[in-house]
Amino acid sequence: MMAQSATFYGNQFVGRKMANGQVYNHGRMVAAHPSLPLGTRVRVTNRRTGKSVVVTVSDRCNCSIDLSRSAFQQIANPRKGRVPVSITRL
């Protein structure tokens, strides 16, 4: 388990190809991570609320983890922008 913080994809990424070759949209349950292998499924848990979501690592980022907007909404209000999370590889 890794303790980090989560952000979410901005609108400018909709329609762009992710590192796995698929096209990003806000409705997919995907995430970008700097080092976990593409295709890895992880549980991302908001450390403040205990809410969690399972996503597939489909892209790369320079941050801890960047969630799709739909995935982020499962664990926090997007107005928060960044939340402390724990990441568990499944």
From Swiss-Prot:
| Similarity remark | To E.coli RlpA.
This protein is called what?
A: Uncharacterized protein ssl3177
Kindly give the Pfam families that the UniProt entry links to this protein: DPBB_1
Q: Which SUPFAM superfamilies match?
A: Barwin-like endoglucanases (SSF50685)
Q: What is the lineage of its organism?
A: Bacteria, Bacillati, Cyanobacteriota, Cyanophyceae, Synechococcales
PANTHER family according to UniProt: ENDOLYTIC PEPTIDOGLYCAN TRANSGLYCOSYLASE RLPA (PTHR34183), ENDOLYTIC PEPTIDOGLYCAN TRANSGLYCOSYLASE RLPA-RELATED (PTHR34183:SF8)
Coiled-coil boundaries: none
